[in-house]
Each structure stands twice: as structure tokens, then as C-alpha cells.
């Protein structure tokens, strides 16, 4: 069955850089068969983005959210763990988050959607380091070029049932006096400080870590490929090493190509 998917490009500034323009042009060139959204705020002049897209006969659909989400990285992270963000796109099956430091090499979007993962991103190395620093592949994965199953994200964010069980709650409140601990455990077993709304509000780190590490630590696990499987979807750090691990084949796309090994590796493919 063909999945209904979209590309979502978050933008927060009027002037587009040289690198961002390369990224946007490649997106419009390679993924023009798909619906492409610009996610931004109402006050932003996006004419530079529209002008580039028009050269490829691509119509960018604008979707506005509150401006504080675009005032810095913290705001962006809040947006991508919010119920409202995914609910806006609930009529689609999958979204490809395509930040403008990503680059796509060929159109494999339908193929990856057909695999029915909940989340795919470039694999990380242990301690967020690199192969060159002696780290091994660890887990999936980076959110800058990532595929997300929208229904799964909505279902998680709509579920207000208690999350942690009795043992985990005892461990959480272990340092409190016994009666206080018992009372807090009982309250938490019916949802007090123990539902998705609470954990979303308390969370202050990167949004991709929320989905790939924080939620699994609470017992909520997404269907994701292994890090080795994800190499053919996207790569970020240690691109030359991962390219070799992928039998010298380019992945579907990549992230932060201008940041990691551009002159020594990526320049032969992206220029």
C-alpha cells in the first residue's frame, strides 16, 4: 500500500545561506514528487525559499506555528515534542524532517515508508563521538534528516495513562521519608507527575533524544531500525567510514555534511 508522506522543512530566518540554498535546491530537485511543507511562523518573509522552489516547479506549502518556537534551539525542540505539531499533519502517514543542513541523494521516500518504522535517523556513535575517536555505532538516531510515523507520535502524545510502574516509582522517590514516598507513589500510579504531558513539560534536551532515548527509558519504545540498518537511510558523523560500511553506496540522505568531513569526503558528491 502506498503511504501518504510529506517533507517538512523548518525555517526560521529570511536570508538563506549558500549551504542552505544547496540543501533546498537538492530537496526540490530530488523530492519534487512529494508534498513539501515549510514550517515557520507568520511574521517571517519566506520569499527567498519560494523563489528557489519555483525554479523546480515545486509549490511549498506554508504551515505557521507560534513564533517562540523559532527563537532558538530550545524552542524548536519544544515544537517537535508537542502534540500540536504532529496533529497538524495527521492526515498523512509519514513526515520526513528535512532541516536545511541535510542533503538527499535520490528519492527513496516511499521505499522507507513501506518499511513501517516509527522513526529513522542517522545512527549515533557511543557518547555522540565518532569512529575516529574510537566509538562504536550505538543507536538511531539524528533528527535533522529523519522519517517519522505521524500516527505513532500522535498516539504517544495523546496517551495520558500513567507510565511508570510501582517499582520504578519507588526508585524515583527512594530518598523521601517512607510515608511521603508511599503517598507520592500512590498518586503517581494514577498519573500525578507520571503521564506524557508531565514528561514533555519537564524535558529540556534535544527533541531527537526525547524520542530515541528518553521515552525508551520510560518504557515507551518506537519501532526503529538497528544503527547498521539506518546507515543506508542517513549518515552524519564519520561519513567516510559509514560509506565504506555501506558497501561504498550513498545513503538516501545525510545530515550536517558541511560540518563533518566536507573537504575530505563529501565534496566529491556535494558541490
Question: Where in the sequence are the language-model features?
Answer:
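Short, aromatic/basic amphipathic alpha-helical patches
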Residues: 22-26, 46-57, 211, 215
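Active-site-proximal specificity loops/subdomain of glycosyltransferases
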Residues: 39-93
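Conserved donor-nucleotide/metal-binding helix-loop-beta segment in metal-dependent transferases, i.e.
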Residues: 103-134
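Catalytic core and acceptor-binding pocket of nucleotide-sugar-dependent glycosyltransferases
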Residues: 141-270
